[in-house]
Design a protein with these regions (language model features):
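Residue-level marker of positions within ordered structural domains that often coincide
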Residues: 17, 57, 70, 201, ...
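Flexible, processing/modification-adjacent segments and terminal tails
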Residues: 36-121
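Gly/Pro-enriched, hydrophobic low-complexity segments
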Residues: 82-217, 222-226
Length: 227
């Protein structure tokens, strides 16, 4: 199970095929926690890219991962006059963004199939590819595919009817989301693939969704790693 909310809040619950919880990662954008129930260790520390990679395996910043999981391109900080966009013969726009920190981002975009005949300012775009390089080295590369619309989540009901329902966390939305996302980080040769079989927009978010307490009997380890 996965929850991702802008700008950098994320929760991942790893469950075995038999329904047994194996690990839970939470990050509110500032603090990170990973409860590894297999070895009864609770890791906690700053929400750095390398800490989040303890579960995802790919060291990318939290806001980058959240954007990609939502089917969006995390845009580098840049000057207003810097970006350029050209049409590629393979059937997509190539948006190139030079950042203020000597990095370059390349984003591949294309309209939804049903929007090709619409005026350009009414076309809804799909993000297919994101690549960020710095001084000639690839920092990360993401491929997004199998785009389809997703519904808005309904309220979360208390099965015992003791508490009022928790409403969706946002307005009605049916935007598309890529069902397959592949993220690669050449150094240290890491990659991860996400496959959505069921998803919805703006699910109810109970208090504490992006944080977790230490469970009794777990060994606590404070972790700090180099970015």
């Amino acid at each position: 199970m996965l929850f991702a909310a802008r700008p950098a809040r994320i929760r991942m619950d790893v469950v075995s095929p038999f329904g047994v919880a194996l690990a839970t990662l939470t990050s509110d954008g500032r603090q990170f926690a990973l409860a590894d129930l297999r070895d009864r260790t609770f890791y906690e520390g700053p929400a750095s890219a390398c800490n989040i990679a303890r579960l995802t395996t790919v060291p990318v910043p939290g806001h980058v991962l959240v954007a990609l999981l939502r089917g969006e391109a995390p845009v580098l900080r840049h000057e207003a006059v810097g970006p350029t966009m050209v049409w590629d013969k393979h059937g997509w726009w190539v948006l190139t963004i030079p950042s203020t920190r000597q990095a370059v981002e390349e984003i591949h975009l294309a309209p939804r199939p049903q929007d090709w005949q619409r005026p350009w300012d009414q076309q809804r775009m799909r993000v297919y590819d994101v690549r960020v390089t710095q001084q000639g080295y690839v920092l990360y590369h993401a491929e997004l595919s199998d785009h389809a619309g997703a519904p808005t989540a309904g309220p979360r009901e208390d099965p015992d009817n003791l508490e009022p329902p928790i409403p969706p966390s946002g307005p009605t939305c049916d935007a598309e989301v890529p069902r397959r996302i592949h993220v690669e980080v050449p150094v240290p040769e890491a990659d991860v693939r996400f496959l959505y079989t069921q998803l919805s927009w703006n699910p109810p978010l109970p208090e504490g969704t992006f944080a977790q307490p230490v469970q009794p009997g777990m060994r606590v380890e404070h972790v700090i790693c180099e970015e």
